[in-house]
Each structure stands twice: as structure tokens, then as C-alpha cells.
Amino acid sequence: MLPVFAYGLAARRKYGDIFKVGNMDNVYLVGGLRSYVGVVNGMYRHVPAEKLGAAVLKQVMAKYAVPKPDYIIAGNGVGAGGNIARLMALEAGVDTAVPAFTIDVQCGSGLESIAVAAAKIACGEAECIIAGGFESSSTQPRRGYNPNHPDYAGESWYSVAKFMPGIHRETVMLEGAELACQREAVSKAELDEWVLRSHRLAAQAQQEGSLRDIIAPCFGASKDEGIRPRMSQRLLDRLPKVLENGEFITAANSCLINDGAAFVVLCSASYLKEHGLTAQAKILGSVACGGDPLVSPRTAVTALEKLLAKYHLTEVDIDDFEINEAFAVIDVLFARTFPQSVAKYNAFGGALAYGHPYGASGAIITLHLLEALKRCRGHLGCASVAAAGGIGTALLLERVEA
């Protein structure tokens, strides 16, 4: 079965009404760029988050000739507050009249930033928005409770925020992935298979330069730092479990801790025409969902199910899926839920290889989705992210023929 949009005008007349939310039919994605992804304390170890984001933002504005968008909307997960998106925009030299604000949905921040930007354009509040995200785990601020407050006497500094009532541990996300493996009866062999696949496809993309058109080089970086071309089963078998009483989670089947930035340009049809821009895709819609915060990895798949149901689509209608594989258990859940789509999933590998710069990851996989659709000459694509605290976000877009 071909995607509904492959049938042209007749399909649009039949299905078009289900894609109209406000004037979402009017939201176009012109293009975007991402940095190379660095590992924590790696090639960007001396680069603050706002400077890394600014370096990519400046290149996006220059490449797509958008000197003064209506908004800058940027995701960031581990900053210390203070609307770091505004600081980043000012660092990039954006006109002070352009408002910028930060989205914090943790891992889903970058994708939710794109969804919010699309909604603003759809409802007529804006004509052009640059959206995405940025993160520096290397320079992540330390946070702590007020030592002078009687309720927090003796509390230590922390780096991982509190995601659910009554639980505040540095290992809470790892514990959630471990629990997901237990509940879903996932085997080590299944996890290993996805780790090897991710690194193999990422290494192939790196060697072939498949993603070179979406890279914004900065600060001397020349490649994605986390990809391991020689990842092997032998290496996976030697890795210890990261949790004291864990059975599944290792350093390989959970994502790296990373630095990176990515932004896309969204605009209306009128802005596109007025400024002589060419769209790569049309944003058709998005959803968010909630789930058990103890097993947040599942929400990436739940969000996709909700997205497809909302727009009356099935997996066979989608030409490429890109999911932020923060843990290999997410891949296993995807394959079990959408068994016909394994061959059209994370075409260039995923976060197990590239890493996961929290605030940027949603924008990164959106850019990878565009490149995958271009390569396969597909029409419809989905991006999805599971976020800490049990939140899932998913986006549906249609590639526009050049």
C-alpha cells in the first residue's frame, strides 16, 4: 500500500481534511543544520551550551537567509534556567527585537520546540520561526537545594533532576530502562542486535557522507564522536551491567551523554513565496502523550501509536520512522509494535551510536528523517522521542518534491 500522499490530488481530496488542525496545511520546513555530536568532556568540553547553540543557529540563519525570524524556540534539558534560549540567541547576534524562549521537556525538548513553532505558524501568530535545541552535558551547571532551608539541610548537589514524586536518584533513567526490559521480557540478544545495527548504519553514513548536507561544522569538530565502526558482539559480551543488581543495561545499549545543537527553519506558505525559499517538507501534525514515569522508554512508541491513530494512518503508510533510541529497549518495543517497519527505521543509525544531547535530539532526528525520506524518495515520515518523567512526543511530516 502506498502512502496516502503518493496518490496525488485525489488522495488529498479524500484525506486532506484529517490533516487540518487550524491551518497546519500552511506550515513548511525549509531546512536545517546540526552540529557534529560530541561525547561528554570530549571535543566540546570547553564550549558552553549557549555558544554551541549559537554557532549552529548563525549558520542556519545564513544558509536559509532568515536574518530576523519571528521567534527562536529552543529546547534545553540540563541548563540552569534563566531562559537560556534567549541567551543563546543573543550570543548568535540575533536582533534583540526577536523573542526567544526555552522549551524543557527533557529528551523531547527539541521535537516539542518544532511542534510549538508549527502551531504558532498554523494559528497565524508567526510567519517564520527557527526551532530546535542545544545541549552541553560537558558544561552542565551543578544544581542543589538551598542549604539554608531547614527542609533541605544536608542535601547534596545533584546533576539529574527529579522526575517523579518521592524518587531522586542519579540512576533513575537507567532503572527505568532496566524495568522496561523486565516488564517486556526483552532478551540481551535483542538489545545487542539493535546496538550493532545502530553503529553499523551510523558508521556507514559517516563513511559515505550521507548526512554532510545537514552538518554545521563548529569549534574544530570533524565527525560525530560517539560512533564505533568496530562495535562487535565480542565487545558487547564483555561489558558489565551498569546497575548493581541489573540484568540488562550496559554502556552500549544505553545512549552516551552528549553535547550538540540542531535547528530547523519553519515558515508559512506566504513567507515561503515572498522570500523565494524552497520547502523540503510540510508539517502535518504532532502529538504528545503521557505514560508510566518508571518506564518512560515506552512512551516513544505510545506517541507514535497516538499520532497514527489521530491521522487515520497505519505503519504501511509511513516511509520512514526516526526514533531517538536513548535505550535499545526502545528499538525492541518499536519492532514488536510495528513489525513491518523495521527496514524503514532509523535509516542512518540512532542515538546508541550518535549519542543523545537531550535538548537537541528531537531536531537532530527530524533532520535525519528529512534525509532518509529524500534518499528513499518517500512521502510521509514520523519522528518520536521518549522523555524523562514518562512523556512521549511525535511529529508527522510530508516530504515536498523539489
What do the PLM-derived regions correspond to, one by one?
Residues 34-61, 78-79, 101-115, 127, ...:
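Active-site pocket-shaping loop/turn-to-helix segments
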Residues 76-127, 167-172, 233-256, 337-365, ...:
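Conserved catalytic cysteine-centered active-site region
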Residues 178, 284-353:
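Active-site pocket-lining segment
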Residues 45-108, 112-121, 125-128, 134-153, ...:
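Conserved beta-ketoacyl condensing-enzyme motif
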Residues 19-49, 182, 234-297, 302, ...:
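Condensing-enzyme catalytic core mediating Claisen C-C bond formation in acyl metabolism
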Residues 34, 46-55, 63, 190-274, ...:
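N-terminal extracellular/periplasmic Venus flytrap/periplasmic-binding protein-like
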Residues 105-135, 181-211, 264-270, 357-378, ...:
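Active-site-proximal alpha-helical scaffold in enzymes
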